Structure formats: structure tokens, C-alpha cells
Amino acid sequence: MEPEAFEICPYDPHHRIPLSRFQYHLASCRRKNPKKAKKMATCKYNACHVVPIKNLEEHEAVCVNRSAVEEEDTENPLKVSPPSSEQNDDTQQVSPCLPSPDIWNVDGANCQHVFVLKTFFPQKVVCENDTKESARETSPQKILRPGQ
């Protein structure tokens, strides 16, 4: 079995972390070192690349993960943008069946189906546990005494 590679923590050089745990460690160490975290920035190509803010542009120009991310962008040209705040849910639905432009005098003949990609953009994320806890806080609690 091959020994696992270790990375050095950018927040504390005394920390040597296995590569498989490095991202978790970065999040933990960032919280424990807020002063140093304010001076550091995360690479947009790899979240495990944390460098001083003044070196970020230089790092991103030569980042080894840069080409992989740029290739994904060219292979997948579909861009999804969130709906604007002006749009509301009552907008008119697009017909799933558009008539062929060649046939204009016959209703519903040779109908071509249109693929519509619907995306979910939550306005507020609420966990099931949060709602249970808030219900417990608002409901009066019954005090149990021995012998009841």
C-alpha cells in the first residue's frame, strides 16, 4: 500500500495533513485563524489552493487546474442564470408543443416538442430539524415530576 501524500496547511505551516482530509482541515483552520484568513484568498480553479491575496492573480495565471476548468466551460456551453426578481411565478407557461413552421394552415399537426429545463432556486432553505426545534421552543413544555 502506497503512503498517502501530505499537504502543508497555509494557515499553520506546522500542520501536515493527508491530501484526502485537506479540504476539511482548511475549513477548520480558517475558522481558528481569522486574522490570517483575512490575508488569504482561495483560488477559483481549486478550493484547496489558498494563497496570500497579493499573490492570487499570479497563482491563478499559472494554476495547474486552470486548463481543466476552462476545458469544461468550452465543452458545456449551456449557461443557466437564476430568474430575475422582476419575474414572478405567475408568468405564462410556454406551450410544450410548437407547430412546425412549414405547416401553418393545420392546427396541431406535426407538433414538435420543446425541451424546457427548469431549475430550482430556493428563496429560503429550511432544514427539517430547524422547524422541529422552533416548534419545541414555542410550545409550552410539560414538567415531569417523579411519581406522575
Swiss-Prot record:
Q: Which residues bind Zn(2+) 2?
A: 43, 49, 59, 63
Gene Ontology molecular function, alphabetical: protein-containing complex binding; zinc ion binding
Give residues annotated as binding Zn(2+) 1: 9, 15, 25, 29
In terms of Pfam families, this protein maps to:
zf-U11-48K
Q: Where are the zinc fingers (CHHC U11-48K-type)?
A: 6-33, 40-67
What InterPro entries does the record tag this protein with?
Answer: TRM13/UPF0224_CHHC_Znf_dom, UPF0224_FAM112_RNA_Proc, Znf_C2H2_sf
Q: Which family does it belong to?
A: Belongs to the UPF0224 (FAM112) family.
The name under which this protein is listed is Gametocyte-specific factor 1-like
- Its gene is GTSF1L
